Amino acid sequence: IDIAVTELDALANIDFESRQVKENFRRLNLVRLGTSGAIQQDIEVGEVVFSRTSLGFDGLLSYYEGRDAVCDLELERAFVEHTAWYDKLPAPYFVDADEELFDLFKDSVREGITIAAPGFYAPQGRWVRLRPHDMHLNEKIESFRFGERRITNFEMEGSALQGLARLMGHRAATICTIIAQRVAKDACTDYKPFVRRMIEMALDKLSTL
């Protein structure tokens, strides 16, 4: 993700002949469309979730200057306390999607806090032979509340996209079709029609910008 975002930013804002930043900044709209698993009982397979806030388990943003300026530190502290976060894991970070993009989509989607996990198995509470360090982390995630806000789903890229975009001054958002209900242990194998519908909806919305 950092390669893709950095190269897109460079194409828009770097003069490749002089290797200098261009005088006139060009702001990009970066929207990830993907699939996701729900971790709240009331979210059904086939629904579309807009990641109003992305929760990064990957640690990527902490390598960049200005990380705290674009993250919700109060939400971070509450989550770390609630989960008794294992201190050998990267520090989790919460970064919001662009508000203008949210306003564009809010009438057609659910909103929530979405985890961006750095792996498919243990980081999302799954295992085959190698067990996660905290076997109860998903239960803590499911029960976490911050006012009326809650964590709704898992995916794997959104926090890096939204965090880097905010640091660079771009607009970004993550929108996912739910193809698995992790609590109810339900999954959709024929999810392409749901994804196609999401893509068509997103393109229609983005064409109005």
Q: Model segments located where?
A:
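Non-transmembrane, aqueous-exposed alpha-helical and coiled segments at domain scale
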Residues: T6, D15-L28, F144-F146, R150-I151, ...
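Glycine-rich beta-alpha junction loops
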Residues: G37, I115-A122, A160, I179-Q181
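Metabolite-binding pocket within alpha/beta catalytic cores that recognizes anionic/polar moieties
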Residues: I1-Y93
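His/Asp/Glu-rich mid-to-C-terminal helical/loop segments that flank catalytic regions of hydrolases
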Residues: R182-L209
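Active-site rim beta-loop-alpha module in soluble metabolic enzymes
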Residues: L73-F146
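Zn-dependent metallopeptidase/amidohydrolase metal-coordination segment
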Residues: S159-Y191
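Polyanion-binding loop/helix "lid" in catalytic or ligand-binding cores
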Residues: L89-D96, I151-A160
